Amino acid sequence: MKEQLNQLSAYQPGLSPRALKEKYGIEGDLYKLASNENLYGPSPKVKEAISAHLDELYYYPETGSPTLKAAISKHLNVDQSRILFGAGLDEVILMISRAVLTPGDTIVTSEATFGQYYHNAIVESANVIQVPLKDGGFDLEGILKEVNEDTSLVWLCNPNNPTGTYFNHESLDSFLSQVPPHVPVIIDEAYFEFVTAEDYPDTLALQQKYDNAFLLRTFSKAYGLAGLRVGYVVASEHAIEKWNIIRPPFNVTRISEYAAVAALEDQQYLKEVTHKNSVERERFYQLPQSEYFLPSQTNFIFVKTKRVNELYEALLNVGCITRPFPTGVRITIGFKEQNDKMLEVLSNFKYE
C-alpha cells in the first residue's frame, strides 16, 4: 500500500437531508445548496436523448467519445486531436496527475481551491506548494514566484472554487508569458458558463500563444449533468496523445455521451439558465451586508464570517443545506424562493 495515502482521507460528502433532519430535529423541506449543482437541471432535450438510447445499455461505450468529441470540436473550433474526456473533471485531473507526476516532482497551486489538485499530487508522491489567496482570489504573482524550471504542473482554478473569484485576461496572459514554456499550466474553468465579467480570459485564444496552457471544462455545472460525469481537457496534441494512454477504455458511458451532446446543442436553454443565475446572484450583492460576500462569477457565493457554524445552522434552520469552510460558508445560488429564505438570514446575521 502506498505510504502517502496515510496523508489523505477519502472524500466525505455532506450529510443527506434525511440525516440532517434527524440530527437537528428539522421539520419540513430541506434544499441541497452545498454542491454547486445546477438546480434547474439539464435541457429537456437531454431527457429525450437518454430515452431514445435506452436500448443500447448492453453495449460498451465508443471509446474516446467520438460523437461528443466532434461536437465539442465544432463548438469550440479546436481540432479533435486536442480534446480528451473523463468521467467528470475529477477523472481528468487524476489522469493528468498520473501521466505527468513522478515521486519528488512539484506542483504549484493555491490554498483554498479545488482539493483534487492536491489530493492526486500526494497520491503520486509529489510535493505540493500552495500559495495563500490574495483578497479571496488566486495570487498569480505569488504563484509565479514559486514556479521554476523544475515545476511539473501548475493548477489554476478560474473562477475559483470555493471562493467564486476570478482573474482577468490580462493577468493570465502576463502569467503565462513568464512561466517556463515546458511547464504545463492547467486552467480549470468548471464554472465558465456562469461568468458575466467582460474581462474574463479567452483561454482558447491564449492557447494559440502558449502551447503549455491547458483548459478544463465540464458538463456537471451549468449544463446540469453532474450525475452523468462528463468533463474534458483541451490541450496540445502531444499532451493529449500521452494522457490518452492513461484514460480507461470506456470511461464515459454511452448515455453520458448522448446526454452531453444534447445539452451542448441546446445553447438557448443554457443561456436561460445562466441568466437566471446571474439575476439571482445579483440579489445577494444588493444586501448592505454584501461586504462579507466575496465577488462571485459562479453559481455560488462565499460568505466570510468568523461564526461559521452559527451561519451554517441558521441557514439550515430555514431549510437550506450549505457548505461550511474554515473561514466562511459557501452557498449555492438556488431558486428565488430558496434565495429569499437565505437573504432573510443573511440580512440579520452578525458576521463578526
UniProtKB/Swiss-Prot annotation:
Cofactor(s) needed by this chain: pyridoxal 5'-phosphate
EC number: 2.6.1.9
Modified residues (N6-(pyridoxal phosphate)lysine): K221
Annotated catalysed reactions: L-histidinol phosphate + 2-oxoglutarate = 3-(imidazol-4-yl)-2-oxopropyl phosphate + L-glutamate
UniProt record, GO biological process: L-histidine biosynthetic process
Any matching Pfam family: Aminotran_1_2
InterPro entries, sorted: Aminotrans_II_pyridoxalP_BS, Aminotransferase_I/II_large, HisP_aminotrans, HistidinolP_aminotransfase, PyrdxlP-dep_Trfase, PyrdxlP-dep_Trfase_major, PyrdxlP-dep_Trfase_small
Key words of the record: Amino-acid biosynthesis, Aminotransferase, Histidine biosynthesis, Pyridoxal phosphate, Transferase
Pathway: Amino-acid biosynthesis; L-histidine biosynthesis; L-histidine from 5-phospho-alpha-D-ribose 1-diphosphate: step 7/9
GO MF term set: histidinol-phosphate transaminase activity; pyridoxal phosphate binding
CDD domains, alphabetized: AAT_like (cd00609)
Family recorded in the similarity comment: Belongs to the class-II pyridoxal-phosphate-dependent aminotransferase family. Histidinol-phosphate aminotransferase subfamily.
NCBIfam families in the record: hisC
Subunit details: Homodimer.
Name of the protein in its database record: Histidinol-phosphate aminotransferase
Gene that specifies this protein: hisC
